[in-house]
């Protein structure tokens, strides 16, 4: 099932499968989100929960039981309950149940996704609550994909990623298998812009740490058109696209947690987490994305 809201600038459609934004159009009717061509990448803007990235061996253990865990958790692949779709807001919820606890994660949780339109900005808030009697630890992040180029008159090299100040991000190495190697390096030093090319992501994503910038955006050079994500407060931000030529979309991904390392233990309790909630506690984060198109 899908729900749609709109204002004078934007029309947003969210699917209850994965609580995923599947369409965002501007006032001219132009589609701003990647439309999930399965030949390139079959998603639009998935939620990453209760972990980000991959797990060593694709599994983890709790109390001696092994659970299978695919990339980026399981919230993106499950049906969420639509709570509200009116005015400028869509709200959905995913609750743990017996099947989830038996097969995916043996802890109680409530994940609420709230989308709100505010002028040319989409605010997407993820709230995690622990209704159970045990500690809840989790990872979480965003993975929106934006159409590139903005129109048929432009090509890949007309675009660049920009920070709001010069940056020398620390790149956390997770190549070639998506697990952290323990190595890090500098790809760019004291740069405010990263030129987009068809080969930029030939070796997969760039996971950046140590950023001071409040925003990361994809800019069309010389026109003023841009999409900017507020990444303030996020310890990690990734940029990525599928290895298609020419580039069809770009992702800007603020994360509160990291993929597992190659040497991580199997025990879930020993994995690094975005947060660890005691019974009754809750936690939330918001990604605000502004579309100047």
Residue ranges and their predicted role:
Residues 1-8:
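Short, Gly/Pro- and small/polar-rich lid/capping loops
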Residues 11-66:
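Acidic-aromatic substrate-binding/catalytic surfaces of carbohydrate-active enzymes
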Residues 5, 96, 101-151:
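Acidic, contiguous internal or C-terminal segments within carbohydrate-active enzymes
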Residues 83-90, 116-121, 150-153, 220-222, ...:
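A short, structured loop/turn motif at beta-sheet edges
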Residues 14, 60-68, 126, 275-292:
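Short Pro-Gly-centered flexible turn/kink motifs
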Residues 226-293:
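Active-site pocket scaffolds in enzymes
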Residues 148, 152-232:
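Active-site/ligand-binding surface loops and adjacent short beta/alpha elements
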Residues 66, 70-119:
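Extended, loop-rich substrate-binding clefts of extracytoplasmic carbohydrate-active enzymes
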